[in-house]
């Protein structure tokens, strides 16, 4: 049976400042930790990315032509405050006013994120969000943006608090490149959630118009053997690290006893302790019912198996299928069922996981209000032929995920939109330019845009709300 989506459903495309804009030192932009980190550790940099800084009118015109009626944009904190605080950079402010005006001119609603992996270098090198002073700096930056950019109707505080802690302190593929420090992971999650809560409370108390929420990456975690209590426990602990800890903070305003039992076990085995203060929980509690929406980024699920050994994580950054490894002491290891498809980067393709995650939020956090799927898409080494990309695999991937969203809506979940990652090809943080996601192919040499076959398919779905 053909499935449909509601008439008012947003069919969006997603971007991020550092992955799309380029112009990393243009017009007074301050440095971010990624600038030097990429030069020192990778085979690419964020120049020119998709040159969105100059070419946004082209991308927004294409958006309008292809039925894309929402766009995720992030503001580069260091374009507004080059050192994260103090002096404002007027050229950065002007750029975003121009960008939002172009969005509205093209009837593409901007959903604007304040922080998408790009803390200004001056603050990042001072401990980033492990340093509590950064909470104040973020709230001040947020307040400036709320006041200044009153044309924005949809705000999100952070993109993917989970993967930031994970990338910076567990996998170690984000600056500062620290590995296997679970205490830092949880402390980063916690301090960022306090920053989120403080910004949301300020937004509501100040009476700004529009809506505000947060974007969480929520990869669903399953036990490898559902009948083995040790595998079930491994999946629960892995879920706490990546999902439950931050969801509890968002919607309960505290960490449930079960969550803290898991956190304490993980830290007992791996070492370290957390600094959780009364005023933090007061801030979390004050904001727990103020979120207007939850953004869910979903790409994959994982299966967890009980494991007794040392932590070892190998990140597959070059698309060499089967090269990744993930095992955490006292938690478990990832082990996928044989029949589940994977991408070249070992990301497991499992649309049912998105349905399960939506329904989990609905069941466990009934004060969620509404959900947008703020990122979902297929990274691929696209072949450019005949001025397009025949990306049937991507169409199939998006179609199956839209179908489970339709199912979730039928089963009572309030899901209001979907943003494909990504609108156009952008550079990927730890994979460079080979891993493409866009509806529009970008020739990074010439910066020309070419619609892929998926763009034509997406346009039809957006126009008809029929998934076929």
Swiss-Prot record:
Transmembrane segments: none annotated. One of its GO terms (biological process) is lactose catabolic process via tagatose-6-phosphate. The active site is at 160 (proton donor), 375 (nucleophile). Pathway: Carbohydrate metabolism; lactose degradation; D-galactose 6-phosphate and beta-D-glucose from lactose 6-phosphate: step 1/1. Signal peptide: none annotated. The keyword Hydrolase applies. SUPFAM superfamilies: (Trans)glycosidases. It catalyses: a 6-phospho-beta-D-galactoside + H2O = D-galactose 6-phosphate + an alcohol. It holds the Pfam family Glyco_hydro_1. D-galactose 6-phosphate binds at residues 19, 116, 159-160, 297, 428-429, 435, 437. InterPro entries: 6P-beta-galactosidase, Glyco_hydro_1, Glyco_hydro_1_AS, Glyco_hydro_1_N_CS, Glycoside_hydrolase_SF. One of its GO terms (cellular component) is cytosol. Its EC number is 3.2.1.85. Keywords: Glycosidase, Hydrolase. One of its GO terms (molecular function) is beta-glucosidase activity. Gene3D superfamilies: Glycosidases (3.20.20.80). Belongs to the glycosyl hydrolase 1 family. NCBIfam families: lacG, PRK13511.1. This is 6-phospho-beta-galactosidase. It comes from Streptococcus pyogenes serotype M1. The lineage of its organism: Bacteria, Bacillati, Bacillota, Bacilli, Lactobacillales. The gene is lacG.
């Amino acid at each position: 049976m053909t499935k449909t989506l509601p008439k008012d459903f947003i069919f969006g495309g997603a971007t991020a400042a550092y992955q799309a804009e380029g112009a990393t030192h243009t017009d007074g932009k301050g440095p971010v930790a990624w600038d030097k980190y990429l030069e020192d550790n990778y085979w690419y940099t964020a120049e020119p990315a998709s040159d969105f800084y100059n070419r946004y009118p082209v991308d927004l015109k294409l958006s309008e032509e292809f039925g894309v009626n929402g766009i995720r944009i992030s503001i580069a904190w260091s374009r507004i405050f080059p050192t994260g605080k103090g002096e404002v950079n007027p050229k950065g402010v002007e750029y975003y006013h121009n960008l939002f005006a172009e969005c509205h001119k093209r009837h593409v609603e901007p959903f604007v994120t304040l922080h998408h992996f790009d803390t200004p270098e001056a603050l990042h090198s001072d401990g980033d969000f492990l340093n509590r002073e950064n909470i104040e700096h973020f709230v001040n930056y947020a307040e400036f943006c709320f006041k200044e950019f009153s044309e924005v109707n949809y705000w999100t505080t952070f993109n993917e608090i989970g993967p930031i802690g994970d990338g910076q302190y567990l996998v170690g593929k984000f600056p500062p490149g620290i590995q296997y420090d679970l205490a830092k992971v949880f402390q980063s999650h916690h301090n960022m959630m306090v920053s989120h809560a403080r910004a949301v409370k300020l937004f509501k108390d100040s009476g700004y118009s529009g809506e505000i929420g947060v974007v969480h990456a929520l990869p669903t975690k399953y036990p490898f053997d559902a009948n083995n209590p040790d595998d079930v426990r491994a999946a629960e602990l892995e879920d706490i690290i990546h999902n439950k800890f931050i969801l509890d903070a968002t919607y309960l305003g505290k960490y449930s006893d079960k969550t803290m039992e898991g956190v304490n076990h993980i830290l007992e085995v791996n070492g370290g302790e957390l600094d959780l203060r009364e005023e933090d929980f007061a801030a979390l509690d004050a904001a727990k019912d103020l979120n207007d929406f939850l953004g869910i980024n979903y790409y994959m699920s994982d299966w967890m198996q009980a494991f007794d050994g040392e932590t070892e994580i190998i990140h597959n950054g070059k698309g060499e299928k089967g090269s990744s490894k993930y095992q955490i002491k006292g938690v478990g290891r990832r082990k996928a069922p044989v029949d589940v498809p994977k991408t070249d980067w070992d990301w497991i393709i499992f649309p049912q996981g998105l349905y399960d995650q939506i329904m989990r939020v609905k069941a466990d956090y009934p004060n969620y209000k509404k959900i947008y799927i703020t990122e979902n898409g297929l990274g691929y080494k696209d072949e450019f032929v005949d001025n397009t990309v025949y990306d049937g695999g991507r169409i199939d991937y998006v179609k199956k995920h839209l179908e489970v969203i339709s199912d979730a809506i039928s089963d009572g979940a309030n899901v209001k939109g979907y943003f494909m990652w990504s609108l156009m090809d952008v550079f990927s943080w730890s994979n460079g330019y080979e891993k493409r996601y866009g509806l529009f192919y970008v020739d990074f040499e010439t910066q020309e845009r070419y619609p892929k076959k998926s763009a034509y398919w997406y346009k039809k779905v957006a126009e008809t709300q029929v998934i076929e």
